[in-house]
UniProtKB/Swiss-Prot annotation:
The modification Phosphoserine is found at residues 163, 166. Residues 1-78, 155-176 are annotated as: Disordered. It is found in: Cytoplasm; Nucleus, Nucleolus. GO terms for biological process: cytosolic large ribosomal subunit assembly; ribosome biogenesis; rRNA processing. This is Ribosome assembly protein rrb1. Coiled coil: none annotated. It holds the Pfam family CAF1C_H4-bd. The gene is rrb1. One of its GO terms (molecular function) is protein carrier chaperone. The lineage of its organism: Eukaryota, Fungi, Dikarya, Ascomycota, Taphrinomycotina. Associates with ribosomal protein L3. InterPro entries: Glutamate-rich_WD_repeat, Histone-bd_RBBP4-like_N, WD40/YVTN_repeat-like_dom_sf, WD40_repeat_dom_sf, WD40_rpt.
């Protein structure tokens, strides 16, 4: 696996799909950034338009000029842009859109569970994130715990009460606490608190050094919420370090039922770390069936002892941790001859699992129809919309048919697999030139460069956070 080169470039290496770090220009601002105006950059969406520029002075009066505004047509990724045309974002399709610039780009991040309530819909919003950096110097890397507050609605229409925001400062606030780490962070995942747990906020990070660290970030969150509360040096140290991996990796996931952590590496191995009897312990032997690097893994949302994994060997596998041989129970040749970069288990319909591959194809599988023997299976749905590798995929936590997909083509596509068109609707789409657009494709978010990961916020319905080489976006579309 190639490493980052300390040179002036912002390009990510493409090998191993989503698990590749990028290099950062050495002239970037090394201070933690701020929120930027949501519409300062041309952040593109499904409702992107091409606008033809007109002449500055054409002899028409104001009324005639209003009647002769530049024509606007929907633009789709891959479409042609002429020299006299420009892309103009349509802010009306976002209820909220904020852009955050950070000190170092995050290859991976996670949204932290909080105690502010479920199904939050009232503005402004507040959330907590954690991101792992990829700095120019290996010794400059850090985990950043962030508090984002005053996330106001950025879409205003005639129905909004003018008095609601007239006296309110709408600039979002970003506060953060950092933990120094050695080596770039390949993956970071926060644990969701199991029932009756006394532990508050556990975090795991997988680094280019091959080390997996487990952290307690409760002190950092308390410090963010209570100005003046300090974080000690001891609290900036990991609770436990997994030393079993021979090389770095990108696969990491916490069990939703208990404090059990799975980590998969580029040596094809998966290790299980558990908390029991007051301490952490990692199994001495790995789960071993994959024949190439393990790219992603996830615990079953419904079965305590079951997890899935995907690999550069073109397969995804289902495992049972009780199997003493530590081999997979089911092998599916999901994308033969192609790296399977990511997977996501549907938390509301546990028999559905989605995978994303290096050729831009993503598929949905019904586990009930798969046989125990290794064979080429048929997905219940498969799409080739993205023009580059799939880097992230995640089911909506509240809508069982909705899924978000990130591609290396700088798109985040949002889909509703329940959508079906009748013949009349199909004819109408064809007349609009949309016959090549899958009807299940509901929204396209663009504007970031080198997007690597996205997550739905479990407690703020429809809200998405994404990380890229150019920073972090926090947004909510009018679609979901």
């Amino acid at each position: 696996m190639s490493k980052r080169a300390a040179e002036e470039t912002v390009e990510f290496n493409s090998k191993n799909g989503p698990g590749q770090r990028g290099t950062v220009a050495d002239n970037v601002d090394t201070e933690m950034g701020e929120f930027e105006d949501a519409y300062e950059d041309e952040i593109e969406s499904e409702e992107e338009y091409i606008e033809a520029d007109g002449e500055k002075d054409n002899g028409m009066d104001e009324e005639e000029q209003n009647d002769a505004q530049p024509s606007k047509i929907p633009w789709l990724p891959g479409g042609k842009i002429n020299a006299d045309e420009k892309l103009v974002a349509d802010p009306s399709v976002y209820e909220m859109l904020h852009n955050i610039q950070v000190k170092w780009p995050f290859l991976s991040f996670d949204i932290l569970q909080d105690s502010l309530g479920e199904e939050r819909r009232a503005w402004p919003h507040q959330m907590y994130l954690v991101g792992g950096s990829q700095a120019l110097d290996s010794n400059d890397n850090e985990l950043t715990v962030m508090k984002l507050s005053q996330l106001y609605k950025t879409q205003h229409d005639e129905n909004d009460d003018a008095s609601d925001n007239s006296d309110v400062e709408e600039d979002p606030i970003l506060e953060h606490k950092s933990i120094s780490t050695k080596g770039a962070c390949n993956r970071v995942r926060s644990a969701r608190r199991p029932a009756n747990s006394s532990k508050e906020s556990l975090l795991a990070s997988f680094h280019e050094t091959g080390k997996v660290h487990i952290w307690d970030i409760a002190p950092h969150l308390r410090s963010l919420d209570s100005p003046g509360v300090m974080v000690s040096r001891k609290e900036n140290s990991p609770l436990y370090t997994v030393n079993r991996h021979k090389t770095e990796g990108y696969a990491l996931d916490w069990s939703p039922f208990e404090y059990s952590l799975l980590s998969g590496d580029n040596a094809n191995e998966i290790f299980l770390t558990k908390y029991s009897n007051g301490g952490w312990q990692t199994d001495s032997s790995p789960f071993l069936s994959h024949t190439a690097a393990v790219e992603d893994l996830q615990w079953s949302p419904s079965e305590k002892n079951v997890f899935s994994s995907c690999s550069c060997d073109g397969t995804f596998r289902i495992w049972d941790v009780r199997n003493k041989q530590k081999t997979s129970a089911l092998t599916v040749n999901a994308h033969p001859g192609v790296d399977v970069n990511v997977l996501s288990w549907n938390t509301r319909v546990p028999n559905l699992l989605a995978t994303g591959a290096d050729n831009g194809v993503w598929s949905v599988w019904d586990l009930r129809s798969l046989k125990s023997s290794s064979s080429v299976a048929t997905p219940v749905a498969s799409f080739k919309w993205h023009r580059a590798p799939i880097y992230s995929i995640e089911w909506h936590p509240n809508e069982d048919s909705v899924i978000g997909v990130v591609g290396a083509d700088n798109q985040i596509s949002l889909w509703d697999l329940s959508v079906e068109l009748d013949e009349e609707e199909q004819d109408s789409r064809a007349a609009e030139g949309l016959q090549d657009v899958p009807p299940q494709l509901m929204f396209i978010h663009m504007g970031q460069q080198e997007i690597k990961e996205m997550h739905w916020h479990r407690q703020i319905p429809g809200t998405i956070v994404s990380t890229a080489m150019t920073g972090i976006n926090v947004f909510k579309t009018i679609t979901f």
